[in-house]
Design a protein with these regions (language model features):
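Iron-sulfur cluster-binding electron-transfer modules in prokaryotic oxidoreductases
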Residues: 1-177
Length: 177
C-alpha cells in the first residue's frame, strides 16, 4: 500500500527483472493483499489482526507450492520479520493465529523457510543484473558512475539488524552495487 503509491510500477518491475531478465521462479498471487502493517503501527488494528493477515499471505505462498517469501515493501518486511520472531518466542500466539485463520477463511500455512526483502535479492543478483543491463547509471558526459544517496527504511535494518545486508549502521544494499 505504501510502496505501490510512492513508487508506482516498482513491484511490477521487480517481478519483470526476476522472472524475465534473470529467469527466476517468482510468483505473485492476484489474491495477495496489503500486510496491514501501517494500520498495525498506527494502532488502528490489533496485533492479532495483522498477524492473521500475514498468516493468510503465507497460506497463499503455501498453496502455490512455494517455501520462500519476498516482501517488496519495507513495512511489510519489518512486519513479517517481527511476526515470525514473535511466533518463535510465543508459539501459543502462533497457534491462536492459525486457529483464527482457519475459522476466518479455512486456510493453513507453513512459515517461510526464508524471508527476504526485494532489495536483498536485487543485491544478491547485482552482477547478473549488471551484465544484462541495457542502461548503466553513469554520467553521460564522463562515463563515471553516478553518486547516489541510499536511504534504507528503519523497518528494513534497525528493528532486526541481522536480517538486512550490512545491518543498521552500515547498510550495503545500494552501496554494494
Amino acid at each position: 500500500c505504501i510502496r505501490q503509491n510512492f513508487f508506482p510500477g516498482s513491484e511490477r518491475m521487480f517481478m519483470e527483472i526476476c522472472n524475465n531478465v534473470l529467469g527466476k521462479d517468482f510468483y505473485e498471487s492476484e489474491h495477495h493483499t496489503t500486510c496491514g502493517g501501517i494500520a498495525y503501527h498506527c494502532d488502528t488494528i490489533p496485533q492479532e489482526t495483522a498477524m492473521t493477515i500475514v498468516a493468510r499471505q503465507f497460506a497463499l505462498m503455501t498453496e502455490a507450492g512455494y517455501e520462500n517469501y519476498v516482501a517488496s515493501c519495507i513495512t511489510s518486511f519489518g512486519n513479517y520479520t517481527e511476526i515470525l520472531e514473535t511466533w518463535h518466542e510465543f508459539p501459543e500466539l502462533e497457534a491462536k493465529i492459525r486457529e483464527m485463520l482457519w475459522k476466518s477463511c479455512r486456510k493453513e500455512f507453513k512459515k517461510p523457510k526464508y524471508l527476504a526483502h526485494s532489495s536483498d535479492l536485487i543485491f544478491k543478483f547485482r552482477n547478473e543484473i549488471a551484465e544484462k543491463a541495457k542502461f548503466h547509471l553513469v554520467n553521460k558526459e564522463t562515463g563515471e558512475p553516478l553518486r547516489v544517496v541510499e536511504h534504507i527504511g528503519c523497518h528494513y535494518s534497525k528493528m532486526f539488524p541481522s536480517k538486512g545486508v550490512g545491518g543498521a549502521e552500515y547498510p550495503y544494499v545500494l552501496t554494494g552495487m
